[in-house]
C-alpha cells in the first residue's frame, strides 16, 4: 500500500518532464545539442556562429530525426522555398495539369479577314517561350485568318495586377530573374541583345533575339579596330524611357577582336512585349494588322479561333527546380490562387491561402511559414527546417514522388548542382534544391547515402557572409556526413 501515493507522483513527474520536453523552449535547447563534428569544424573555419545555422536530417520511414539543430527557428530559405511551391502545385493540381492561351474573334471572318478585334486571353502559361509563341501564331494563321482589321486586345486578367515594380527587389529591373508574373508572359519578357563587329563597314551591327515589332534599338556603338582588351565592358546598355519603355540604347566602344557579344535583358511591359512579338511573328507568317494593341476583357460573344496548350505541370516543375526559375515559380504560385477562387483574378493572398490549406490537409502546420511570392526571391519569406523537411517527407510518400524527385537538381549532373558534389561516389546520388541570396545559403532535398538509405536533408544558413563560401562549405561537410550514414 506504500506504493499507491508514489505511482501518481511518478506519473505526474513523467508527464511534467514530457510536457517540458515538448515545450518550445526545451525543444530549442535540445535542438542545439548535436551537430556532426565535421559540420561544427566547417562552421568554425568559416567563422559562422551556430545561431545563424539550422539543420534537419531524417531518414525516410523513421520517426526521429538524426540531426535537429535550431530546427524551429524561422529562416529565409531563398530558392529552396520552390520545394514548397512545386510540391503543393504538383499534389493539388496534378502532374498532367496544363495552361491554355486562347485567341478569339469579336467579328466575322470573311475571305481571311477578321472584321473586328483579335482577343488574346492569357491563361498564366509559365513557359511561353518564343518558339512556343511562334507555334501559337502559326496555329492561329492556320485557323484561316490573314488580316486582323481591328485591334489586338490583350486580356491578362487571369492574374490580378501585382502593383510591384520589376526593380523592387534589388533595383536591377533589367535582370531576367526579376521578371514579374503576367497571365500572358511571353519569352519571360526577355530579349538577347547581340552585337557583331563588321570590319567591312567599320561598324557594330546590333540586333535583338527575339525582336518585338514595337521595340526600338538605338545603336551608337563605335567599332575599335584591333585586339579585344575590355570585352563587353565598353558597351553601355540603357533604357532611356525607363525599364518598361519600348526603347533600348547602346553606346560605347567595342573592339573588332571581341567577336560576337550578347546579353539578355528583361524589357518593356508584359502586354507590350507579347503584342510586339505577336506582331513580328504575325507579319513573318504573312499576316497584317489594321489597328494597334490595347488591354481589355474578353467579350461574352467572342468566338474561339485557336487554343494553345502549355507543357504539363510535371514538366514545368522540373524547369522551376532544376534551373530555379523565379517567374515560373511565381506563375505556379498564382495558378494555385486562381484555382482556389475560380472566375476571380488570382492574387498572392489567394495563393498563400491555397498553399497553407494544402499543407494543413497534409498535417503540416507550418505556423512560421511566410510566403511572399513562392519563388524565394524575397527578403521576407520564412520557413523553418522542420517544416521544409515535413514537405519533403510528404513528397517522398506521395503517389507523385517520381515526378517530384525528378524535378530536383541531380548532384554533379544537371541544373544548379551540375558542378557540385563531384566526388565519383556522390554523382547522381543527391536530389536537392539550392538557394542563394545575399546573406542566405540553403540546400534541401534527398541524399541517397552509400548505405542505400535515403535521408531528407535540410540546411539553411542566414548570415552576412552566407553566400560568399561559408554556406557551401557547411553544406559540403553536412552532406558528406549524411552520405556516410
Across the structure, where does each feature detected by a protein language model lie?
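Positively charged n-region of N-terminal signal peptides that target proteins for export
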Residues: 3-9
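Bacterial N-terminal signal peptides
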Residues: 10-22
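Beta-lactamase-like hydrolase cores
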Residues: 27-60, 65-74, 139-143
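Conserved serine DD-peptidase/penicillin-binding transpeptidase domain
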Residues: 28-43, 92-366, 473, 481-485
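Soluble periplasmic/extracytoplasmic beta-strand elements of cell-envelope proteins
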Residues: 54-58, 66-68, 85, 102-104, ...
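Residue-level preference for non-acidic, small/hydrophobic
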Residues: 63, 82-89, 152, 184, ...
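Small-residue-rich helix-loop
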Residues: 66-69, 323, 333-485
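Short active-site loop at a secondary-structure junction
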Residues: 68-88
Amino acid at each position: 500500500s506504500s506504493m499507491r501515493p508514489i505511482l501518481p507522483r511518478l506519473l505526474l513527474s513523467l508527464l511534467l518532464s514530457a510536457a517540458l520536453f515538448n515545450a518550445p523552449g526545451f525543444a530549442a535547447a535540445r535542438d542545439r545539442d548535436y551537430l556532426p563534428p565535421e559540420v561544427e569544424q566547417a562552421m568554425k573555419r568559416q567563422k559562422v556562429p551556430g545561431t545563424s545555422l539550422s539543420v534537419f536530417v531524417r531518414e525516410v520511414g523513421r520517426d526521429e530525426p538524426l540531426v535537429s539543430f535550431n530546427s524551429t527557428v524561422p529562416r529565409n530559405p531563398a530558392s529552396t522555398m520552390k520545394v514548397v511551391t512545386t510540391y503543393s502545385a504538383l499534389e493539388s493540381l496534378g502532374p498532367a495539369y496544363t495552361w491554355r492561351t486562347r485567341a478569339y474573334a469579336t467579328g466575322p471572318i470573311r475571305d481571311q479577314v477578321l472584321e473586328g478585334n483579335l482577343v488574346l486571353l492569357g491563361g498564366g502559361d509559365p513557359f511561353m517561350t518564343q518558339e512556343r509563341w511562334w507555334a501559337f501564331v502559326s496555329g492561329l494563321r492556320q485557323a484561316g485568318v490573314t488580316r486582323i482589321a481591328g485591334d489586338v486586345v490583350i486580356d491578362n486578367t487571369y492574374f490580378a495586377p501585382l502593383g510591384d515594380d520589376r526593380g523592387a527587389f534589388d533595383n536591377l529591373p533589367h535582370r531576367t530573374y526579376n521578371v514579374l508574373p503576367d497571365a500572358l508572359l511571353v519569352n519571360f519578357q526577355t530579349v538577347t541583345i547581340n552585337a557583331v563587329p563588321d570590319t567591312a563597314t567599320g561598324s557594330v551591327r546590333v540586333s535583338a533575339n527575339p525582336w518585338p515589332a514595337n521595340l526600338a534599338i538605338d545603336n551608337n556603338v563605335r567599332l575599335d579596330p584591333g585586339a579585344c582588351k575590355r570585352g563587353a565592358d565598353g558597351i553601355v546598355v540603357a533604357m532611356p524611357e525607363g525599364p518598361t519603355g519600348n526603347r533600348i540604347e547602346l553606346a560605347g566602344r567595342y573592339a573588332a577582336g571581341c567577336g560576337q557579344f550578347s546579353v539578355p535583358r528583361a524589357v518593356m511591359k508584359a502586354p507590350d512585349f507579347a503584342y510586339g512579338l505577336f506582331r513580328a511573328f504575325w507579319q513573318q507568317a504573312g499576316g497584317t494588322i489594321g489597328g494597334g494593341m490595347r488591354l481589355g476583357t474578353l467579350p461574352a460573344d467572342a468566338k474561339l479561333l485557336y487554343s494553345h496548350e502549355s507543357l504539363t505541370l510535371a514538366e514545368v516543375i522540373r524547369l522551376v527546380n532544376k534551373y530555379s526559375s523565379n517567374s515560373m515559380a511565381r506563375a505556379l504560385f498564382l495558378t494555385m490562387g486562381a484555382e482556389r477562387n475560380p472566375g476571380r483574378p488570382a492574387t498572392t493572398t489567394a495563393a498563400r491561402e491555397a498553399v497553407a490549406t494544402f499543407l494543413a490537409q497534409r498535417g503540416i502546420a507550418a505556423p512560421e511559414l511566410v510566403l511572399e511570392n513562392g519563388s524565394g526571391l524575397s527578403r521576407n519569406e520564412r520557413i523553418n527546417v522542420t517544416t521544409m523537411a515535413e514537405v519533403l517527407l510528404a513528397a517522398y510518400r506521395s503517389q507523385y514522388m517520381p515526378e517530384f524527385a525528378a524535378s530536383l537538381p541531380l548532384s554533379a549532373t544537371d541544373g544548379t548542382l551540375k558542378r557540385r558534389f563531384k566526388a565519383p561516389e556522390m554523382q547522381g546520388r543527391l536530389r536537392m534544391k539550392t538557394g542563394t541570396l545575399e546573406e542566405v545559403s540553403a540546400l534541401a532535398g534527398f541524399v541517397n547515402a552509400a548505405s542505400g538509405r535515403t535521408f531528407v536533408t535540410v540546411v539553411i544558413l542566414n548570415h552576412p557572409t552566407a553566400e560568399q563560401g561559408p554556406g557551401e562549405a557547411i553544406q559540403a561537410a553536412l552532406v558528406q556526413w549524411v552520405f556516410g550514414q
